[in-house]
């Protein structure tokens, strides 16, 4: 987060304010949490960033607290508890400020929790509203859950939503249902694997779209919702774009949730396509066999065609730029038994991956046509990139490698223009800003995250853990 010449950086253990021109630390505030907290966090002891509003910095903590700090001094101004870690909840999400409300999501779907989005008063920390992402039987959508399965239904909200101030609408992606074993929870399982359009003042839902009903493959839909104006069938249209974890690239009319396009952008075998009238996937025998308890090889894997790392859209080229994954996974259900604060997935986690033949590229930085899903160019990587992507008005695309290279590509051709070795894996989101007539680009470097935890990629064994901020000046 960069604001008025100051870079605000968060980790799981601290918040820092750094002078953007000199790199001098202005203040640092430590984050304390109970020692047992990391055991409850699914997929990385991390924090995804901060928000700023009226002189306050807002962030979340691993033990599911929302805090406000004085932007000038780092002094804690208020702290509110969103959920109980003993029940399996945690927080890594960056808050979003929309229409004078601080919005936060929650993690914990792998622990048998029930997801939600909260609204908070930025001045006092007062809790204003909560929108449950898994409805109870007396709420709209409650009939898509059988019995009491909704109580453990998942639907985490661990990636920040997008705000359209013109329509005063927040678009927030919802995670996978719990457990993975879909036989435990018959029905469509709303509003998991969906995008919700919300009024930020009240949390009231304007519309929803579900990408993957009754999903068994951990294809959560939390990844960024990119808002843009583009021409669709000859008409100017306000769209929402999502490179979904299920392998399909979706374009929706963001004013009403109507599906405009849905095409595969990576290899997909769990569905043969998307029904454009209903928006529902046309499932293959792979999905049917998985629900029946048979072991299958599924594409994409449970890490998806793209995971959390944000893509970027360039209105000049009309292309979306995304770090994608090109490997599949082995999937087989197991019985799911719930115990508070412990994993509740119902899946064999001992043999997860179906790697490309001959140890080929496991991921690609792709330039994708949003309306067709077709790739204009790609930059393969033996080890998949897990950083966010930044595209600039100058026609440059920035991304990073898990082995430490920070890279720049030509947005139109994909030609690599430059790279710099940062010394550790890059998994953060690059950011750019202009200050005193100079354009800067910054990125954090520090190896970790879901791929390092679960992939078992020995090629990363010698990558140092890192933990640094790099700032570069862009020269003509």
Locations of the language-model features?
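Extracytoplasmic beta-rich repeat domains
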Residues: 1, 28-51, 76-94, 111, ...
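Short coil/turn segments that connect the beta-strands within blades of beta-propeller domains
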Residues: 4-6, 54-55, 99-101, 166-168, ...
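Residue position within the beta-strands of beta-propeller blades
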Residues: 9, 59, 102-105, 172, ...
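Residue-level signature of beta-propeller blades and closely related beta-rich strand-turn architectures
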Residues: 13, 63, 108, 176, ...
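Beta-propeller blade signature
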Residues: 69-74, 115-127, 188-204, 249-257, ...
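Short, conserved, GDST-rich strand-edge loop motifs in beta-rich repeat architectures
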Residues: 104-116, 172-190, 326-358, 446-464
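Loop/turn-rich, solvent-exposed surfaces of beta-rich toroidal or solenoidal domains
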Residues: 229, 325-326, 357-415
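Blade-level signature of beta-propeller repeat domains, shared across WD40, Kelch, NHL, RCC1
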Residues: 430-476
């Amino acid at each position: 987060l960069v604001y008025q010449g100051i870079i605000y950086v968060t980790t799981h253990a601290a918040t820092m304010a750094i002078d953007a021109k000199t790199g001098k630390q202005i203040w640092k505030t430590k984050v304390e949490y109970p020692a047992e907290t990391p055991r409850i966090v699914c997929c990385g002891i991390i924090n995804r960033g901060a928000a700023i509003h009226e002189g306050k910095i807002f962030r979340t903590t691993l033990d599911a607290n929302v805090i406000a700090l004085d932007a000038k001094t780092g002094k804690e101004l208020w702290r509110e508890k969103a959920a109980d870690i003993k029940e399996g909840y945690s927080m890594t999400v960056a808050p979003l400020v929309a229409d004078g409300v601080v919005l936060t999501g929650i993690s914990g779907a792998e622990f048998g929790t029930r997801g939600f989005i909260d609204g908070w008063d930025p001045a006092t920390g007062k809790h204003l509203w909560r929108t449950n992402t898994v409805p109870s039987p007396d709420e709209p959508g409650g009939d898509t859950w059988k019995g009491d399965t909704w109580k453990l239904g998942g639907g985490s909200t661990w990636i920040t939503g997008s705000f359209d101030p013109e329509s005063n609408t927040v678009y927030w992606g919802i995670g996978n249902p719990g457990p993975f074993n879909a036989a435990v929870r018959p029905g469509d399982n709303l509003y998991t694997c969906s995008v919700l359009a919300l009024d930020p003042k009240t949390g009231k839902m304007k519309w929803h779209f579900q990408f993957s009903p009754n999903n068994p493959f951990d294809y959560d839909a939390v990844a960024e919702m990119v808002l843009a104006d583009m021409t669709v069938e000859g008409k100017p249209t306000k769209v929402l774009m999502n490179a979904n974890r299920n392998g399909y690239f979706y374009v929706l009319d963001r004013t009403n949730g109507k599906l405009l396009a849905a095409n595969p952008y990576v290899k997909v075998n769990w569905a043969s396509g998307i029904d454009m009238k209903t928006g529902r996937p046309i499932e293959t025998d792979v999905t049917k066999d998985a629900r029946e308890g048979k072991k299958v090889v599924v594409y994409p894997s449970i890490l998806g065609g793209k995971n959390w790392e944000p893509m970027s859209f360039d209105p000049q080229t009309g292309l979306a730029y995304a770090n994608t994954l090109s490997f599949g996974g082995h999937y087989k259900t197991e019985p799911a038994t719930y115990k508070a604060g412990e994993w509740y997935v119902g899946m064999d986690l001992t043999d997860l991956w179906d790697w490309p033949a001959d140890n080929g590229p496991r991921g690609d930085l792709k330039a994708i046509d949003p309306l067709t899903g077709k790739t204009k160019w790609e930059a393969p990587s033996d080890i998949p990139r897990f950083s966010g992507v930044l595209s600039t008005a100058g026609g440059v695309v920035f991304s990073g490698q898990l082995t430490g290279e920070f890279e720049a590509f030509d947005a139109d051709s994909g030609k690599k223009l430059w790279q710099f070795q940062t010394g550790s894996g890059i998994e953060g989101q690059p950011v750019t800003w202009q200050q005193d007539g100079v354009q800067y680009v910054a990125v954090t470097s520090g190896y970790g995250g879901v791929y390092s935890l679960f992939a078992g990629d020995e090629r990363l064994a010698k990558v140092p853990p890192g933990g640094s901020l790099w700032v570069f000046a862009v020269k003509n």
